[in-house]
Amino acid sequence: MSPDCLDEALVAAAQAGSSEAFSRLVERHQQALRAFLRRACGNWAQADDLAQETFLAAWSRIGRLKAGASVRAWLCGIGYNKHLSAVRSGARDRIREASYEADRETARGADAADRMALEAAMGDLPVEQRACVALCLAADFSHAEASEALGLPLGTVKSHVTRGRSRLLQALGGPDGR
């Protein structure tokens, strides 16, 4: 069974009230959601909290998920909205004590200094731009999937990715020399 067909079957079962099916959906998508939220907010502890809030909200809204819709994009959209709510409420400022020592996982091929520089540069991007970059460049979402997940027009997502990439390259001393 293809991953999309499995998701559709699990969604149908969860919509019928199966908490086991929803648990399987959580298992299948939690890594991608947490990775996106970690890049979007720059704080692992906050990202994990937001992921939990996202899954709670998703369970209560599972009936609203349309047949054939991308579960991953739907969850990232809910997570993004949770992140925006946290930013608006000032939670980011209260939580933003950057504990880089807690971040023991390193990005593939990048040492700790490179990872910290990337996290700092991502943190300097505007919220929507950061979310687009995190989804399209780090989580391998297509522009269309990111547009669906974030509720932004496709052209806006493309612009945010292009500008975000440029700003990251500039901040990190990238090859384009800008």
Spell out what each predicted region is:
Residues 35, 49-56, 60, 69-81:
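Structural recognition of an alpha-helix C-terminal capping motif at a helix-to-coil junction
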Residues 60-67, 77-98, 111:
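Arg/Lys-rich amphipathic alpha helix in sigma70-family domain 2
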Residues 43, 142, 151-156:
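Helix-turn-helix DNA-binding motif, specifically the short coil turn and the N-cap/start of the second
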Residues 3-7, 85, 92-120, 142:
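Internal acidic/polar
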Residues 15-24, 34-53, 66, 176-178:
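Short, charged helix-capping/linker segments at alpha-helix termini
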Residues 132-136:
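A short pre-motif secondary-structure segment
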Residues 1-2, 13, 42, 120, ...:
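C-terminal edge and immediately downstream basic/flexible tail or linker adjoining helix-turn-helix-like DNA-binding
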Residues 1-32, 39, 123, 170:
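N-terminal module of bacterial RNA polymerase sigma factors
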